[in-house]
Amino acid sequence: MAAKNSSVTEFILEGLTHQPGLRIPLFFLFLGFYTVTVVGNLGLITLIGLNSHLHTPMYFFLFNLSLIDFCFSTTITPKMLMSFVSRKNIISFTGCMTQLFFFCFFVVSESFILSAMAYDRYVAICNPLLYTVTMSCQVCLLLLLGAYGMGFAGAMAHTGSIMNLTFCADNLVNHFMCDILPLLELSCNSSYMNELVVFIVVAVDVGMPIVTVFISYALILSSILHNSSTEGRSKAFSTCSSHIIVVSLFFGSGAFMYLKPLSILPLEQGKVSSLFYTIIVPVLNPLIYSLRNKDVKVALRRTLGRKIFS
């Protein structure tokens, strides 16, 4: 399959580095990241599924965040690892569009899941008496469907705009994956309208969750400052700060990559920026949201205890 009015049937992914001496060390480094991502997120999914006391709105969203991170990483990392060990990392046009679609779907869905999690924490801390009513099963399901719906819409918009481009002789993608901006650069017709579509869709898909997340955490911190003891403040600040760091990495690197004109941001810098939301954040999420979480630690001990004594 080729693009509309295009002679290109496959692409070559350039990868992360041109230096042969770095390929093997980087292969093992990112293989390690991928292993931690898979084990951490699948472990968290299993724990939440097996322990009924974790069947609450917070862990409902965390379950889906871990599922997205696992799928997201699996969409990107295996093909990226191939670029370190093969001379020419070829991907078919269909394979490239499929990777692009799922990349967009998971990254947009994660944006809205993170905003739903921030809203859940806001209600739990600032309006605890209304929590069970505000975060009912129906509301949680609607928020989840909204997140996946926005992910699907964003993926269709981006993939559709790329498939309508014309690709000529050049098929070398200056990236370790099929991403929007490197593919726009390969187009041999004007990509102005496509860049405009990217900017508008990303502004919505990043802007709405960012506003929700940071307003929620600002209200949480304000409530903590006014109502908590010194010890409670310290614990809450520690938890909120770690969450905000991960969220800032995810949204900040995405905004840095996509909310600038193609001519301003060199793609070499874009590749490095992409590492944060494609590799680093899926590794950090299960660590931040589980190892610092008392309920998850208790669930882990109970689960391991049942396995040992069964």
UniProtKB/Swiss-Prot annotation:
Pfam families named in the record: 7tm_4
Cystine bridges: C96-C188
Extracellular side: 1-24, 75-98, 160-196, 258-270
Topological relation to the membrane, as annotated: Multi-pass membrane protein
GO CC list: plasma membrane
Keywords: Cell membrane, Disulfide bond, G-protein coupled receptor, Glycoprotein, Membrane, Olfaction, Receptor, Sensory transduction, Transducer, Transmembrane, Transmembrane helix
TM helices/strands, residue ranges: 25-45, 54-74, 99-119, 139-159, 197-216, 237-257, 271-291
Glycosylation sites: N5, N164, N189
Subcellular compartments: Cell membrane
One GO MF term attached to the UniProt entry: odorant binding
Stretches of the chain found on the membrane's Cytoplasmic side: 46-53, 120-138, 217-236, 292-310
Any GO BP annotation: sensory perception of smell
Family of this protein: Belongs to the G-protein coupled receptor 1 family.
Function according to Swiss-Prot or TrEMBL: Odorant receptor.
Protein name (database record): Olfactory receptor 8B12
Taxonomic lineage of the native organism: Eukaryota, Metazoa, Chordata, Craniata, Vertebrata
